[in-house]
């Protein structure tokens, strides 16, 4: 059996989790999600199948060589050492794409030119003949990716972006790429709706991309079946017999699938758009199965052929760029909402928009919100259940807010105003807005970009539980209005004092991890599955301090949690890192965070171990150590319990023993009554740096943590 080959699939930003699931379903192994794509392993047949069947990938890349490329000459030499005669003939054609990040070579076209020169010169020197350049349909297309002067040179098996299915009529512009349209449909739940015979309607279909992609999904049609060109067709190692077998299988599945398509209709007010949609459907071989008709939104009616299965209304309405356009579009979104309420009761709906404010005029509460990107534009997909209880104004009249709730709302507004300038100046997107500022409303409100995390502090026994519940209901009523978010964007959790293993207590496995940014780092957070989210907001300055200290250093991260400090250290130029935690769940999360930032490598190790046992046996020394233990901990994996006040002398001494000469230990914990035992650590220089590590959004709570800079005397 052949050894698995490494590949990388690119995808639109925001689609990565869906892509990873799709790759696994298509037989890929060792799938690892990163920003704008996913790496995986498999056979060449697996890669062919993904090229043919992936609805979400943009390109499928097969790395040929990895090397350092600190200057153009080093790049040229490394590319020239690749045996290109194994991949193409001297009479063949090639093209080169290049993407550079944090590279000393700072011009992508120049880098691509040096790759081309190296390939061509190798053929000229060895065969006295050189390949020619074909930018449109070369025999092989190469992809050069350089990050931090480390280069990966890959064969682009797709040849052209996979969103080009081959059915878009020439000269027809589309606001959505086909793979983004497929992602919208998957997030909207169309596969389940279509499988049960539900109808699909797009009332503003444009050139028909959403309707056609929906038909390809439900009819089990391989999206690549109509493509005229592939990047592996002229590759010398192409296995034509494997590809032909996959094509034949796809044709048979398509023929069977087309027999069971439900009612699928696209409407648009523009006659040119309808003509384009019909032509696209013809090129996709679906014209006999889809309907495209001219219809104003105001004239939209119920679909008579929908049957009892209901269906999905999905659309990408215009969202305007100029002020006048936005004003006009408010009535369009309101009209869409009126049609949904009047004619599509019992259906599901999905609206993809680059202006979420306009979507509020639909007048129906979304039950799911997803962040996707249309090119560089951040957009939202809002999913709706068309049911009366979801309509704005359908709830029973609410009693006026109590005086306390009004004061809570005003405090939120005051905090927003006070933080606004600081947030902009420091480029902070995840922060604490409120932390029991009013003791009666004992919650912490954290903002994670466009989502809200609310933690209710457990009320003392002296507080009437019914009063506490009433105030919590008021909190949840006030937040959407003040923060201008949908209720579904708010996650509520009860926070209790940690006991034993509760710091790793799992809650509801309903949540998904999503990306947030912290300066130049990206992290995955999860607001529902655990008591904590994966990102301790109060340690933001500490992480940036570690990043500033890390260049060229060996870094050890102890009690590492999700590895956010490791990501900062690597971003700061740490030469090597070791990340230690006793939870496999959090170590896997830490590795995912490093991959998300495209920083993975053999120089960055992850160790699942009891930290105390690890410190006792570790022999290596480190220039920079971050030690952030819990206040109290015990688990089946630990031989003893950890009490930070009782045990801090021993654990600090063990960690400090691993410092190199001149090395620095940053020690932190969250025990509010912590007292450093200086007398028991005379060999160490210990400086309290807590004040410098408390961020502005936690200034009201300066005891949220304590932090110490420790060196050997």
UniProtKB/Swiss-Prot annotation:
One of its GO terms (molecular function) is 23S rRNA (guanine(2445)-N(2))-methyltransferase activity. InterPro entries: 23SrRNA_methyltr_KL, DNA_methylase_N6_adenine_CS, RlmKL-like_Mtase, RlmKL-like_Mtase_CS, RlmL_1st, SAM-dep_methyl-trfase, SAM-dependent_MTases_sf, THUMP_dom. The lineage of its organism: Bacteria, Pseudomonadati, Thermodesulfobacteriota, Desulfuromonadia, Desulfuromonadales. It is found in: Cytoplasm. Keywords: Cytoplasm, Methyltransferase, RNA-binding, rRNA processing, S-adenosyl-L-methionine, Transferase. Specifically methylates the guanine in position 2445 (m2G2445) and the guanine in position 2069 (m7G2069) of 23S rRNA. Its main location: cytoplasm. The gene is rlmL. Gene3D superfamilies: 3.30.2130.30, RNA methyltransferase domain (HRMD) like, Vaccinia Virus protein VP39. Residues 46-157 form the THUMP domain. It catalyses: guanosine(2445) in 23S rRNA + S-adenosyl-L-methionine = N(2)-methylguanosine(2445) in 23S rRNA + S-adenosyl-L-homocysteine + H(+); guanosine(2069) in 23S rRNA + S-adenosyl-L-methionine = N(2)-methylguanosine(2069) in 23S rRNA + S-adenosyl-L-homocysteine + H(+). CDD domains: AdoMet_MTases, THUMP_AdoMetMT. It holds the Pfam family Methyltrans_SAM. This is Ribosomal RNA large subunit methyltransferase K/L. GO terms for cellular component: cytoplasm. Its EC number is 2.1.1.173, 2.1.1.264. Belongs to the methyltransferase superfamily. RlmKL family.
């Amino acid at each position: 059996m052949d050894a698995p080959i490494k590949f990388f699939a690119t995808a639109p930003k925001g689609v990565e989790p869906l892509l990873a699931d799709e790759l696994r379903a298509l037989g890929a192994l060792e799938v690892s999600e990163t920003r704008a794509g996913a790496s995986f392993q498999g056979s060449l047949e697996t890669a062919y199948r993904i090229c043919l069947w992936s609805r979400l990938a943009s390109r499928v890349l097969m790395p040929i060589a990895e090397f350092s490329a600190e200057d153009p000459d080093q790049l040229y030499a490394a590319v020239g050492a690749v045996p290109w005669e194994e991949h193409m003939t001297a009479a063949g054609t090639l093209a080169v794409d290049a993407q550079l990040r944090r590279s000393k070579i700072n011009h992508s076209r120049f880098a691509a030119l040096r790759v081309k020169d190296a390939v061509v010169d190798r053929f000229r020197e060895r065969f006295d003949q050189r390949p020619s350049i074909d930018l449109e349909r070369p025999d092989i297309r190469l992809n050069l990716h350089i990050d931090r002067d480390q280069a990966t040179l890959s064969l682009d098996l797709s040849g052209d972006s996979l969103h080009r299915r081959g059915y878009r009529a020439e000269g027809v512009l589309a606001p959505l790429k086909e793979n983004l349209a497929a992602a919208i449909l998957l997030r909207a739940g169309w596969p389940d709706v279509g499988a049960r015979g539900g109808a699909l309607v797009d009332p503003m279909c444009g050139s028909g991309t959403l309707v056609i992609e929906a038909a390809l999904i439900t009819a089990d049609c391989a999206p690549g079946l109509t493509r005229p060109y592939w990047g592996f067709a002229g590759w010398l190692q192409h296995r034509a017999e494997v590809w032909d077998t996959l094509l034949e299988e796809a044709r048979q599945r398509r023929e069977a699938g087309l027999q069971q398509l439900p009612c699928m209709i696209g409407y648009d007010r523009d006659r040119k758009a309808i003509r384009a949609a019909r032509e696209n459907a013809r090129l996709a071989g679906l014209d006999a199965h889809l309907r495209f008709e001219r219809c104003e939104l105001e004239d939209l009616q119920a679909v008579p052929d929908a049957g009892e299965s209901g269906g999905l209304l999905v659309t990408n309405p215009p969202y305007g760029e100029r002020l006048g356009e936005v004003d006009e579009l408010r009535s369009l979104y309101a009209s869409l909402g009126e049609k949904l309420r009047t004619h599509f009761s019992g259906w599901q709906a999905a609206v993809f928009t680059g202006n979420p404010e306009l979507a509020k005029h639909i007048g129906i509460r979304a039950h799911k919100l997803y962040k996707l990107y249309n090119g560089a534009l951040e957009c939202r997909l809002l999913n709706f259940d068309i049911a009366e209880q979801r309509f704005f104004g359908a709830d029973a009249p609410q009693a006026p807010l109590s005086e306390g709730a009004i004061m809570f709302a005003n405090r939120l507004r005051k905090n927003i105003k006070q933080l606004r300038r600081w947030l902009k100046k420091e480029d902070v997107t995840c922060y604490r807005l409120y932390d029991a500022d009013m003791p009666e409303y004992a919650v912490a409100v954290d903002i994670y970009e466009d989502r809200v995390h609310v933690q209710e502090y457990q009320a003392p026994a002296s507080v009437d539980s019914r009063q506490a519940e009433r105030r919590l209901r008021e909190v949840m009523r006030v937040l959407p209005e003040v923060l201008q978010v949908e209720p579904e964007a708010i996650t509520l959790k009860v926070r209790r004092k940690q006991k034993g293993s509760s710091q790793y207590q799992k809650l509801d496995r309903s949540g998904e991890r999503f990306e947030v940014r912290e300066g130049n780092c990206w992290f995955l957070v999860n607001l529902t599955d655990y008591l904590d989210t994966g990102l301790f907001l109060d340690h933001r300055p500490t992480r940036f301090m570690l990043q500033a200290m890390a260049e060229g250093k060996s870094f050890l991260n102890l009690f590492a949690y999700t590895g956010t400090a490791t990501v900062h250290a690597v971003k700061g130029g740490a030469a090597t890192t070791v990340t230690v935690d006793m939870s496999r769940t959090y170590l896997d999360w830490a590795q995912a965070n490093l991959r998300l930032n495209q920083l993975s490598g053999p120089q960055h190790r992850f160790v699942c171990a009891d930290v105390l046992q690890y410190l006792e046996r570790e022999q290596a020394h480190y220039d920079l150590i971050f030690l952030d233990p819990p206040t109290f901990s015990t688990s089946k994996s630990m031989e003893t319990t950890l009490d930070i006040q009782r045990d801090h002398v021993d654990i600090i001494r063990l960690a400090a023993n691993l410092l190199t000469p001149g090395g620095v230990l940053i020690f932190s914990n969250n025990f509010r009554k912590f007292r450093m035992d200086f007398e028991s650590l005379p060999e160490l220089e210990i400086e309290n740096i807590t004040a410098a590590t408390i961020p502005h959004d936690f200034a009201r709570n300066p005891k949220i943590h304590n932090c110490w800079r420790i060196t050997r005397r």
